[in-house]
A protein has these predicted regions:
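A structured beta-alpha segment of the ubiquitous adenosine-cofactor-binding alpha/beta core
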Residues: 1-4
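Short histidine/acidic/glycine/proline-rich micro-motifs that form metal-
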Residues: 17, 45-46, 145-146
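Gly/Ser/Thr-rich beta-alpha loop segments that engage phosphate groups in nucleotides
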Residues: 17, 105, 152
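Conserved core of the sugar-phosphate nucleotidyltransferase
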Residues: 20-106, 118-119
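Left-handed beta-helix
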Residues: 84-95, 109-196
Length: 196
């Protein structure tokens, strides 16, 4: 199917996440770095690191190592974000931070077509590690709100948060509107009004 369409870049997006990312920044960094693959990442703590693909990047944000759901303490330690990189990213002094794959990727056309024609069947276990090994692969570090809502628990908790007075995810941000069909618009919100 992809062979019949002309495109330069292909996005892989997960359908079970809640976030508000400016994709123009991701593609801008991808082009600037002359990347073949860009992986969106988010800083996570040590406890969460075992549930994600974790990567180590250099000062230019090029991915140097990738481990899918690391379990061994020594391996996890080796993937910790270095102090210099934490400072460059403005992440603060917490030493136990790791860069987790968000399941959001940008591929150059030729690279994606090569992997689609391969025998690989699992994206996280086969394609991403091989692409990082063989291609110019970079991390786009996202520091906004992101929640994986792929389990009943996380979906439920995200819905409870969305119903709170000040939810972590802002559905009413005028700088980042949510475009959808009218029947799916968020509820009305009234600020600074007095009701008699």
């Amino acid at each position: 199917h992809f062979h019949n369409h002309r495109f330069d870049y292909l996005w892989i997006l997960s359908g079970d996440q809640l976030y508000n990312m400016d994709f123009s920044k991701v593609i801008g960094q991808h082009i600037k770095n002359d990347a073949e693959v860009t992986v969106a990442t988010i800083p996570v703590d040590r406890e969460a690191a075992t549930g994600f693909g974790i990567m180590q990047i250099d000062a230019d944000r090029q991915i140097r190592e990738f481990v899918e759901k690391p379990q061994e303490p020594d391996v996890i330690d080796s993937l910790r974000i270095p102090a210099e990189t934490r400072n460059d990213l403005g992440l603060g002094d917490d030493e136990d931070q790791y860069l987790a794959s968000m399941g959001i990727y940008v591929f150059n056309r030729d690279v994606m077509l090569k992997y689609l024609d391969s025998e690989h069947i699992d994206f996280g276990k086969h394609i991403i590690p091989e692409a990082i090994d063989q291609c110019r692969s970079f991390s786009y570090v996202y520091q906004g709100y992101w929640e994986d809502v792929g389990t009943i628990r996380t979906f439920f908790e995200s819905n409870l948060d969305a119903a709170s007075e000040l939810p972590k995810f802002n559905f009413f941000d005028m700088e980042a509107p949510i475009f959808t069909r009218p029947r799916f618009l968020p509820a009305s919100k009234i600020n600074g009004a007095a009701i008699d």
